[in-house]
Amino acid sequence: MLLELSEEHKEHLAFLPQVDSSVVAEFGRIAVEFLRRGANPKIYEGAARKLNVSSDTVQHGVEGLTYLLTESSKLMISELDFQDSVFVLGFSEELNKLLLQLYLDNRKEIRMILSELAPSLPSYHNLEWRLDVQLASRSLRQQIKPAVTIKLHLNQNGDHNTKILQTDPATLLHLVQQLEQALEEMKTNHCRRVVRNIK
């Protein structure tokens, strides 16, 4: 699978052929550092002074490289696909090899950093349910409304917790229909592309 870069990202990466390969390698190190600790304007300013360019140019170059490395790592694209994705940018063969080496050296670490940044959401463990109906009452003059009680067991970071929910059957039926509709929508090509890019 090829990585598709927007025109903006191509513009950001267009700065890389203008600098030495050691500078590109340093930009790669800064890009991984950017993922670990966030942006550091002092590093951009120092590099900009050494290269006699604006700090925005350096920042855009690092951000473009960060995007290239993170998206490639996220999608776990192969060496060949990475080379083909970078080939479209029109860089020299030496720069393409350097970018490939940066990707191969850092992809495991980048995936680890991205997994740490992902939010930890509760996951389903078990479900118990009960239908409550009042069978008889002398004082009851309106129609009997049954209630569905649901006990939901969840796991989050090894901790177990329980949520108790209660609703009427009509609302539960509507909820089931909405969930089934969402599951059907997940089978569309658009949703599959989105999910593939999220991973």
Curated annotation (Swiss-Prot):
Domain named COMM is located at 123-190
What CDD domains does the entry give? Commd2
Q: Keyword set for this entry? A: Cytoplasm, Transcription, Transcription regulation, Ubl conjugation pathway
Q: Where in the cell is it found?
A: Cytoplasm
The main location is cytoplasm
An example of a Gene Ontology cellular component annotation for this protein is: cytoplasm
Transmembrane helix recorded as keyword: no
Cystine connections = none
Tell me where on the tree of life, at the top rank, the source sits. Eukaryota
Q: What does this protein do?
A: Scaffold protein in the commander complex that is essential for endosomal recycling of transmembrane cargos; the commander complex is composed of the CCC subcomplex and the retriever subcomplex. May modulate activity of cullin-RING E3 ubiquitin ligase (CRL) complexes. May down-regulate activation of NF-kappa-B.
Describe its assembly. Answer: Component of the commander complex consisting of the CCC subcomplex and the retriever subcomplex. Component of the CCC (COMMD/CCDC22/CCDC93) subcomplex consisting of COMMD1, COMMD2, COMMD3, COMMD4, COMMD5, COMMD6, COMMD7, COMMD8, COMMD9, COMMD10, CCDC22 and CCDC93; within the complex forms a heterodimer with COMMD3. Interacts with RELA, RELB, NFKB1/p105, NFKB2/p100. Interacts with CCDC22, CCDC93, SCNN1B, CUL3, CUL4B, CUL5, CUL7.
What family is reported?
Belongs to the COMM domain-containing protein 2 family.
Instruction: State the protein's name.
Output: COMM domain-containing protein 2
Species of the source = Pongo abelii
Gene responsible for this protein: COMMD2
